[in-house]
């Protein structure tokens, strides 16, 4: 059960809708304080063997679902050596081409060890905040962030320097866990309904 909190007379750093067993005020920190951020790269396409392998190489157009299991293009182990190998559970967002509505604000969580292109930014938690919580936060705010803060003339992009400064309010680990399970369940039901439709 989720209850509505009346914050009219008391300014708290908490959401209006909340599980009733949690009463503590949420803390706030910047993304850079809570996550390590990594951008990717593209192995040279002049060497055709680079794209003949089984290592995930995620591009910005693939971040439409909650979880990403396999990328459209796979690279070789040799090509992957020059890139950052991201662990399972890494949150990845699109940072290039944000003038396009279908790309702006998109992000997914990896279900396999993966590498990424330079059009993506990856986030791994330092411990305070789970990647699943960041996914939920970005799902709510990512589109507005792209519209307001992306830079560039023809192509609108976000950068490390922009993203690391954003402040996030977050609950304790127990409340994060319950919220993450609840949101994952909602996403699963939405995905099931979309398949039926």
Tell where the protein language model's regions lie, with residue ranges.
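Non-catalytic DNA-recognition/assembly elements of restriction-modification systems
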Residues: 16-42, 65, 165
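Short, Lys/Arg- and Gly-enriched loop/turn segments at beta-strand edges
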Residues: 100-108
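Short amphipathic coiled-coil heptad-repeat segments
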Residues: 1-24, 192-197
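A short glycine-rich beta-alpha junction/loop motif
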Residues: 11, 113-121, 151-174
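Acidic/polar-enriched heptad-repeat coiled-coil alpha-helices
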Residues: 180-184, 195
């Amino acid at each position: 059960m989720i209850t509505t909190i009346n914050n009219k007379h008391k300014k708290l750093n908490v959401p209006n809708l909340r599980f009733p067993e949690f009463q503590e005020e949420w803390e706030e920190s910047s993304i850079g304080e809570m996550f390590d951020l990594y951008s990717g790269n593209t192995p040279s396409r002049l060497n055709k063997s680079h794209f003949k392998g089984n290592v995930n190489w995620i591009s910005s157009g693939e971040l439409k679902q909650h979880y990403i299991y396999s990328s459209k293009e796979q690279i070789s182990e040799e090509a992957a050596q020059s890139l950052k190998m991201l662990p399972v559970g890494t949150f990845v967002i699109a940072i290039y081409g944000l003038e396009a509505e279908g790309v702006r604000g998109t992000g997914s969580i990896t279900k396999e060890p993966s590498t990424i292109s330079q059009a993506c930014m990856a986030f791994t938690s330092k411990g305070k905040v789970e990647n699943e919580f960041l996914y939920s936060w970005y799902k709510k705010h990512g589109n507005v962030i792209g519209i307001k803060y992306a830079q560039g003339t023809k192509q609108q992009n976000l950068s490390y320097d922009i993203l690391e400064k954003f402040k996030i309010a977050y609950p304790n680990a127990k409340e994060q866990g319950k919220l993450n399970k609840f949101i994952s369940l909602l996403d699963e039901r939405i995905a099931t309904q979309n398949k039926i439709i």
